[in-house]
Every structure is written in structure tokens, then in C-alpha cells.
Amino acid sequence: MSGDQGQAGAKRPIRRALISVYDKTGLIDLARGLHEAGVDIVSTGSTAKTIADKGIPVTPVEFVTGFPEVLDGRVKTLHPHIHAGLLADTRKPEHVEALAKLGIAPFDLVVVNLYPFSETVESGASVDECVEQIDIGGPSMVRAAAKNHPSVAVVVEPNGYDGVLAAVRTGGFTLAERKILASLAFRHTAEYDVAVASWMGSTLAPEEPAQKLPAWVGGTWRRAAVLRYGENPHQQAALYRDATAWPGLAQAEQLHGKEMSYNNYTDADAAWRAAFDHEEICVAIIKHANPCGIAISSVSVADAHRKAHECDPLSAFGGVIATNSSVSVEMAETVADIFTEVIVAPAYEPGAVEILSRKKNIRILVAAQPPTTGTELRPISGGLLLQQRDALDADGDDPVNWTLATGEPADPATLANLKFAWRSCRAVKSNAIVVVADGATVGVGMGQVNRVDAARLAVQRAGDRVRGAVAASDAFFPFPDGLETLTEAGVKAIVHPGGSMRDDVVTEAAAKAGISLYLTGARHFAH
């Protein structure tokens, strides 16, 4: 055999193929094309039957192995006559001689896709049904062929079949092409193994009840888009999707506008999550991952947007808007008059997209509701952090469980505003103070390194609207100064977690100011 087969540009002819697929998409066209090109086809079980039923010559794998399919199909291809043909490096004379002595023919092409394990799990199937969909022979063939890519080409998805037929007609795949196919194949089996291992760890062999988080975490992400740049123009960036995750912003459909940027995605994700923190119709406007305004309404989504925008119109310029409701024509008319980077919603009423599209560059997204459970990952140098998602589901997130530390019990309207303020705090970077009136933020103090400055910023932004408003703090007041900043400005009721060594001093300051002060016992830091 000539040495030029080891060169990247040299092609290796395809004379013998092994095909074993669960997904039969494109199978007949592939098999017919291979046959017409003079390729001998060896196949397994239902794949062989599907090919033969169309009158295409095919050799059942048991004719090659001399051993029948057994154990309900669990053993079909796990045989030396198959794997020697996959693993023989035909660049090596000793491998070629060994095959000849054993009467084994090498394979030039392997086409395999695997049992639908993840789909079976997602369907709610029983444990036994899921176990039966753990493919053994398929990954073994794929890995063997991929390892032996100098001699074998391997294809694992139907979207690669056109490339196979093109290669067959033009003398085969080059070594460089076989390397790419091998890389794709190992990614395919890696994704499969991660799915199986994750399911095994969570279902068949879960941690002890005291261990709420797994001892091992695996995941795979596929690049979905190369972005113009990252947070800054000198940084490269791309969007990756987790095929096993709850559909989220990464899977959003873009209806109009320029391509999404890295910062668009981070802000849209923050806005999307903030909007769904509330059961009522809600609109959140985000800039640099912090709220410019959040509002709820019992009237309309347009009303919620109006109130959210009024919180901080200056900062909302060039912001990202999200709502948990369908965007109405009325809201679209208003948004179309404001420079907005992105708007994301679960749906749009007829005519709304056309109105928004008057702005050439606005990015219009449709996305599914974000998950309310699960875990979050954050990379750090040398590892990552994993935590339970803050889903506002702590006992202290329900006003029924709040403790009135001082003052008169709030009336229903005031309590509703306190609840909204408390839930809105989750979306604000710590230290966070939120001032609320009539179901809308009117002042947001975010990202300060001390709580009193967060209170001052919230009061400053609220202006005259602070009088008679309510406020929430994402963590306890360590000193009374932050609370006093709010009460002196005119805030009439405050909710905070409590738990400080100086809670009694803070409560005394609230009593002196004559306000209602509630303790939640829960905290909502966001870093």
C-alpha cells in the first residue's frame, strides 16, 4: 500500500461499509448510493432488513461473524470478525497479514447512530426501558472506527450522508477529512456517555439524602453561533447550547434584527429571568445585567412596560426588555419609539412584530419560560461552582411566613408592594435596595459595596416618588444607617431578611421612624 495514504490530501477508496443505525433517516438513499458505487454493505438487524426490503444488496452481520444475534439484540457486532476489520491499521503490513490469515476483510466506512437514550429518559419511560436504550455495540464500533481513522471513515449523523456519497464518487475521504469525522464521532459518544452517566448518578445510584449536590458533574455544549466578539471587541466569543437542558434563551428564535452579541445574551438572560420572577404580568428592563425598571400590572402588558420604563428612562435607553406576557400592539408602539437593543417574550400579538420591525436593528426574540428549578454553574480558576438555582422558593419568600418586627401590619396594597419589592431584589446585583410604588420599581440601588450607599442610590433615583413608597433589601441591614436613609426620605414600610447582630438596633430605628418592618429570614444575594 502506498505511503501517500498517510498524507492529509490522499484519499482512501471506500469498498466496504458497515451500517447500523437506529435513526433510519436518509438510510435508503445512502445504501442505494453506496451500492451503485460498488461498495459492499454489511449491516445489522432492522437496518439490514430496511435496506434489503428496498432490493438493495446487503450482507447481514451474522453472515460475517458466523454467530447469531442473541440476548434480544444486545450482542450483534461485539465479535472479532467485526472489530478486527474496524481496528486494523492498513498502513501496517503486519495488520494486513493478520487479517489475511484470519480471513477478515477490513472496513473502509462505518455509519452508526445510537439508541435514543436521552429521548427515552425524557419520555418518562421506566428504568428498565431506559437501561435497554443504553447502546453498547454502537459506541464500540464508533470508537473503534474513530481511533482507526487513518484507515476508516466514520459517520454518526444522517446530515453527513451527502458527504459520504460525494466522497464515494470522488475516490473516498482524505486523511484530513477522516480526522474531522473521527473528532465528531468521539464528541458524539462523549455526549452519549455523559447523558448515561448523569442519569445513572441521579436515578440509579443517587447520592445519600444528605448530599444535595452530585459528586460528579458532566455536561456537553455544542457551538451554535460565533459571535462578533465578547464583552469587549478584543475578546472572541461564541454561543453554545446544551441539548439536554430546559429550552432557554440559548434556544430562542430570533424574528428580526441584527445578530445577537455576547452582551445582548447576558442582559437578555437577566431580563428574561427577572420578568418570570413574578406571577403577574411583568416587564423588566435591564442594562449591564441590572434592572433599569421592573413592573407588574393587572391591566395590561403595555401598562407594565410604561411603569417599568418610568423607573429610570435615562438608563433604559439602549436597554433590553423582557416580559412574561404576550407583547401587545400597544406595547410595541411604545417600544418602537425607544432605542432598545433586544426584546424577548413568549409570544407577540398579531401586528406587534411588524410594528417593532420598523426599527431595523432591534432584536426580537421568542423564548420558552426559563427553568425555575435545577442548578447553576459558574467557572472559577481551576474549577467551577455549582449551586441550586435561586427560584424564590424559600419559606421566607412567602409573605405568610414573614415576621412583623415593628409597626402596624401592612394593609393589603402595601403588603403586595412589599412582596413585589422583595421578589424584584433577586434580579439586582448586591448590595441591593429596591424602592417600589404601585407595583413598579421607582428607585434601584444596585451593586454597591455597602448597604447604606445602595439605599442612598435608590433614594436618589426615586426622587419625590420615594415618599409613601416601600423598600426591600436583599440582605440584612448591618447598621441602622441604611434603613434610616430610606425612612428619612419617606419610605413607609421595609422588608429585609434580618439576622444581623444588630437587628435590635435596626428594629429600634424603624420603630422610631414609625414604619412597618418585616423580616423574611431568607436572603437573595446576587454576585
UniProtKB/Swiss-Prot annotation:
Enzymatic reactions: (6R)-10-formyltetrahydrofolate + 5-amino-1-(5-phospho-beta-D-ribosyl)imidazole-4-carboxamide = 5-formamido-1-(5-phospho-D-ribosyl)imidazole-4-carboxamide + (6S)-5,6,7,8-tetrahydrofolate; IMP + H2O = 5-formamido-1-(5-phospho-D-ribosyl)imidazole-4-carboxamide
Residue ranges of every copy of the MGS-like domain listed in the record: 8-156
Q: Name one GO molecular function term.
A: IMP cyclohydrolase activity
The record's Gene Ontology cellular component field reads:
cytosol
Keywords linked to the UniProt accession:
Hydrolase, Multifunctional enzyme, Purine biosynthesis, Transferase
**EC number(s) per entry:** 2.1.2.3, 3.5.4.10
What processes does the entry annotate via GO biological process terms?
'de novo' IMP biosynthetic process
Kindly give the Gene3D superfamilies that the UniProt entry links to this protein: 3.40.140.20, Methylglyoxal synthase-like domain (3.40.50.1380)
Which superkingdom does the taxonomy of this entry point to? Bacteria
- Metabolic or biological pathway: Purine metabolism; IMP biosynthesis via de novo pathway; 5-formamido-1-(5-phospho-D-ribosyl)imidazole-4-carboxamide from 5-amino-1-(5-phospho-D-ribosyl)imidazole-4-carboxamide (10-formyl THF route): step 1/1; Purine metabolism; IMP biosynthesis via de novo pathway; IMP from 5-formamido-1-(5-phospho-D-ribosyl)imidazole-4-carboxamide: step 1/1
Q: What is known of its domains?
A: The IMP cyclohydrolase activity resides in the N-terminal region.
**Which family does the record assign?**
Belongs to the PurH family.
> PANTHER family of this UniProt entry?
BIFUNCTIONAL PURINE BIOSYNTHESIS PROTEIN ATIC, BIFUNCTIONAL PURINE BIOSYNTHESIS PROTEIN PURH
The identity of this protein, by name, is Bifunctional purine biosynthesis protein PurH
Q: Which gene encodes it?
A: purH
